[in-house]
A protein has these predicted regions:
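Secretory targeting and sorting signals
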Residues: 2-26
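Extracytoplasmic low-complexity segments
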Residues: 22-88, 190, 232
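Extracellular glycan-recognition modules
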Residues: 29-32, 41-46, 82-145, 180, ...
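Localized edge beta-strand/strand-to-loop motifs within extracellular or lumenal beta-rich domains
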Residues: 167-181, 235
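Flexible glycan-contacting loops in extracellular carbohydrate-active proteins
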Residues: 192-226
């Protein structure tokens, strides 16, 4: 990320924050975590600039301190899908914390990414069979999808077009009590009504792929590309 102001611009560009125009415009009070990904090459700690101390661990296969297209971020190299061995050091991981679980709150995840690949889980907390539910953003066939699964059910929204063109894109997924909304580069591209309910698991938050996988019966879905920042908000 170039600076804190970059994140503020990305957030307020969206006409929808928690699902209604009346609440558009994020403030620092909404922030749960902000990982600006400005660390130097070789860094092992992912800093949280929200003030909440939700630091993460940067695997040594993650390229920190990469400058590309006017932004400093992390680079995740391409790994062949569903091909052993696993690469746990391909991930950036934040330990489980109550603040990171959506619970029943309105909850938004914002990421800025660039990729030319057609697969991978960008960010997730929990997996498909996790007790307590899970959420994730993934990019199969270059198309961003967002999923939230909770006590009341599961919802998935997907962008209508691929964004794996090598350019920077800002993706925002908003879970409210009414459903899911997906915003790409400031425009709402998908919306689905429905309930997801309570989401609270004991898993870490993982950036770059799954933490519990073997690349045989469970693929690790490693992301390949660059990330500029990740932010989480809740209200």
């Amino acid at each position: 990320m170039r600076c804190r102001r970059s994140f503020a611009v990305a957030v307020t560009a969206a006409t929808l924050l928690w699902g209604t125009p009346a609440t558009a415009g994020a403030t620092s009070n909404n922030l749960v975590a902000l990982w600006e990904m400005n660390e130097s090459p070789g860094a092992q700690t992912m800093l949280d600039s929200s003030g909440h101390g939700l630091r993460g661990w940067i695997g040594d296969e993650v390229g920190a301190g990469v400058w590309v297209g006017g932004a400093t971020g992390y680079r995740f190299s391409r790994l062949e899908p569903d091909t052993p061995p696993t690469h746990p050091r391909h991930l950036a991981i934040v330990p489980d914390a109550t603040a990171l679980d959506p619970g029943s709150r309105d909850y938004a995840v914002t990421i800025r990414l660039r990729t030319t690949e057609r697969f991978g889980n960008i960010i997730q907390k929990g997996q498909a069979t996790a007790a307590g539910g899970n959420f994730k953003l993934q990019i199969p066939s270059g198309i961003v999808q967002c999923l939230f699964r909770g006590s009341a059910g599961s919802l998935l929204v997907a962008a209508p077009r691929a964004i794996n063109d090598g350019g920077w894109h800002t993706v925002r997924c908003v879970r409210t009590r009414a459903g899911l909304t997906l915003i790409v580069d400031g425009s709402t591209v998908a919306r689905r009504s429905g309930l997801t309910g309570w989401i609270d698991n004991a898993w870490p938050l993982s950036i770059g792929g799954k933490t519990n996988c073997d690349q045989v019966s469970v693929g690790c879905d490693y992301f390949a590309g660059d990330l500029d920042y990740v932010a989480i908000q809740a209200a």
